[in-house]
């Protein structure tokens, strides 16, 4: 039912990833700050978003779009809305760390029906469609259906989290929550890309994840991937 959209998104996500890899670990990142000194954007964020948006408007001119850098675009009031984070994990990217991702979701009448997350450097592609399950394609080309971890206890679980950019307003910034939960779990990871974190949850590579003050574009695609892999997403 949603194959048309998936077949459109796959090359789109990979094309955005190629833009990011072209700048990665180079001297021409064009790093700027946004809301504060901790919140950064790069030339690759802007160019990959423009590439995605242009393709969507060319193929689906009647659709709406919400994206991280450009905000609301396209046709207001459309039954279809695309939710895009062109480069999730910009801090990692700007530091030369390889965990970052392209996140593209499509909503129909407010419900997410397709989600794709692509980690360009790692060569990992995750996707899901409503009622169609969740899948991952590795760099080698192997495709497998995803299923979340079956672990039932915190003591055996490895969790992931992240930290908001509002350190000036909220000094605790999730560190208080981390301190409370550390004694009860096997370990905690901070990968630096919410979309990739959640994709790892869907793949059973991590057992749980929480984060504060995320935006819709951070998690829209990956939330569907988690749900279609048998996971639970709550706010």
Feature locations, PLM:
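DPxDG-like acidic metal-binding loop motif
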Residues: 76-135
């Amino acid at each position: 039912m949603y194959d048309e959209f998936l077949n459109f998104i796959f090359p789109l996500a990979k094309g955005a990833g190629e833009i990011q890899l072209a700048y990665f670990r180079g001297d021409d990142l064009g790093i700027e700050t946004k809301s504060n000194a901790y919140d950064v954007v790069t030339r690759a964020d802007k160019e990959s978003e423009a590439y995605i948006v242009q393709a969507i408007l060319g193929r689906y001119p009647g659709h709406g779009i919400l994206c991280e850098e450009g905000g609301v675009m396209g046709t207001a009031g459309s039954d279809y809305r695309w939710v895009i984070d062109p480069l999730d994990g910009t801090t990692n990217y700007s530091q030369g760390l390889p965990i970052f991702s392209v996140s593209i979701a499509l909503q129909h009448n407010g419900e997410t029906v397709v989600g794709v997350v692509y980690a360009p450097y790692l060569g990992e592609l995750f996707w899901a469609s409503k009622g169609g399950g969740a899948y991952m394609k590795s760099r080698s080309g192997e495709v497998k259906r995803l299923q979340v971890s079956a672990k039932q206890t915190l003591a055996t679980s490895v969790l992931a989290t992240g930290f908001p950019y509002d350190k000036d307003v909220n000094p605790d910034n999730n560190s208080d929550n981390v301190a409370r939960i550390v004694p009860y779990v096997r370990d905690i990871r901070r990968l630096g890309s919410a979309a990739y974190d959640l994709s790892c949850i869907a793949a059973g590579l991590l057992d749980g994840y929480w984060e504060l003050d995320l935006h819709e574009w951070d998690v829209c695609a990956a939330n569907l991937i988690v749900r279609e892999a048998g996971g639970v997403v709550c706010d």
